[in-house]
Design a protein with these regions (language model features):
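Catalytic-core regions of core metabolic enzymes
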Residues: 31, 71, 82-83, 115, ...
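ATP-dependent carboxylate activation and anion-phosphoryl transfer catalytic cores
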Residues: 1-50, 60-63, 78, 100, ...
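A short helix-to-beta-strand connector/capping loop
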Residues: 27-28, 72, 102-105
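Glycine-rich phosphate-binding loop
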Residues: 57
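A conserved helix-loop-beta module that forms one wall/lid of the active-site cleft
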Residues: 79-141
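Short Gly/Thr/Asp-enriched flexible loops that form oxyanion-binding sites at enzyme active sites
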Residues: 60-73
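N-terminal Rossmann-like NAD(P) cofactor-binding module of classical short-chain dehydrogenase/reductase
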Residues: 54
Length: 277
């Protein structure tokens, strides 16, 4: 908001959390204390008639309504809706990784026990990581070591539908997790740093600590991470910020996910490299 104001734009902030810095009275020209949901954002959009809406700086919530906003005629600035959809859809993103030759842990989706058993067999057996597809923050995630545990988990799962399946991934043993933030104008990609997690992969990144610069990641793995990040940003035609999450198992780098938005890690490389991302 401050950068846009310096460029001469009037800025409008939508945020219902009064504890955040973005709701300070001097951050934006106008501030709406409203839920970041389709109905409320549309009402503000029709009233203010802005040049466009930026969905990259509000965490996951704005991305969840980006497609619906676009369908209602809202102009989304930055990374395109189609690219956001690819990054958010596990099947589409995996197909892109296959095309780029970038490895991901074997995974699948299931809506019932038969599909779950078939998925585990396809992945290569136990242990597997299973979680609902419609929650954030690692809620409902569990490591499954045998068929009995799988049957018990699926039986207790609530709200599972074809649109909200269970996600099943191969469990990575003693894997190191790391992240990379990237900034792109659609052509050039800038990667300020790679962040190494203190905890092993599997601890939710919001509950873990990061180190900049990395301590135990090899130069070869660092080069691979930056190469993968650049290729993915270019393939998605990212215009703005992107956060990449990786896991390293036995010296091999696996992509976990791409977030086409600013992550909570953005201030870390900015502070450590003394360059604003």
């Amino acid at each position: 908001a401050m950068a846009l104001r310096e460029m001469g734009y009037e800025t409008i902030m939508v945020n219902c959390n009064p504890e955040t810095v973005s709701t300070d009275y001097d951050t934006s020209d106008k501030l709406y204390f409203e839920p970041v949901c389709l109905e409320d954002v549309l009402q503000i959009y029709h009233k203010e008639k802005p040049a466009g809406v930026i969905v990259q700086f509000g965490g996951q919530t704005p991305l969840n309504i980006a497609r619906a906003l676009s369908d209602e005629g809202v102009k989304i600035l930055g990374t395109s809706i189609d690219s956001i959809d690819i990054a958010e859809d596990r099947d589409l993103f995996r197909k892109m990784m296959d095309q780029l030759g970038i490895p991901m842990p074997e995974s699948g989706m299931a809506t019932n026990i038969d599909e779950a058993l078939a998925c585990v067999k396809q992945i290569g057996g136990y242990p597997v990581m299973i979680r609902p597809s419609f929650v954030l923050g690692g809620r409902g995630m569990e490591v499954i070591y045998d068929e009995n545990m799988l049957r018990e988990y699926v039986a207790k799962a609530v709200g599972v539908t074809p649109d909200r399946p269970l996600l099943i991934d191969r469990f990575l043993h003693n894997a190191l997790e790391c992240e990379a933030d990237a900034l792109s104008d659609g052509e050039h990609v800038y990667i300020p740093s790679v962040m190494e997690h203190v905890e092993l992969a599997g601890v939710h990144s919001g509950d873990s600590a990061c180190i900049i610069p990395p301590v135990t990641i090899t130069k070869e793995n660092l080069a691979t991470i930056k190469d993968y990040t650049r290729k993915i940003a270019e393939a998605l035609h990212v215009c703005g910020l992107m956060n990449m999450q990786y896991a390293i198992e036995d010296g091999k780098v696996f992509v976990l996910e791409a977030n086409p938005r600013a992550s909570r890690t953005v201030p870390l490389p900015q502070a450590s490299t003394e360059r604003a991302t």
